[in-house]
Regions:
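Non-heme di-metal
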Residues: 1-120
């Protein structure tokens, strides 16, 4: 279960990408009201990272070697033991290609709506 949930931490649609998306885009936003909203949302996404991290920690803190292997968590465990590392469930490490910051208000806001599943 933790191997799947960790994708919400550092996967392509995870909280790390979301927080960086909003916090990066705020600097080129021409409207101060929107800058504040992007800052607030980015900060909220950081809080989501903390919650996901707590869930992964609770799921992994007392695993036995047998459980680690049986659950498929062994490939993660080899490199990180039970430390939190941002990656997708596939094992791909977090990369900044997961989010965009183009410097154009319409483009950035459209990307935000698409990333959050909002109807565009």
């Amino acid at each position: 279960m933790a191997a799947l949930i960790i994708s919400q931490f550092g996967g392509p649609d995870g909280e790390l990408a979301a927080s960086q998306r909003y916090l990066s885009q705020r600097y080129s936003m021409p409207y101060k009201e929107v800058v504040g909203v992007l800052n607030d949302i980015g900060t909220e996404e950081l809080a989501h990272m903390e919650m996901v991290s707590a869930i992964v920690h609770q799921l992994t803190r007392n695993l036995t070697p047998e459980q680690i292997k049986a659950s498929g968590f062994d490939t993660y465990f080899v490199d990180h033991t039970v430390g939190l590392w941002p990656q997708a469930a596939s094992g791909m490490p977090f990369t900044s290609v997961c989010f965009q910051s183009k410097g154009d208000a319409i483009t950035d806001l459209t990307e935000n709506m698409a990333a959050d599943g909002t109807t565009v």
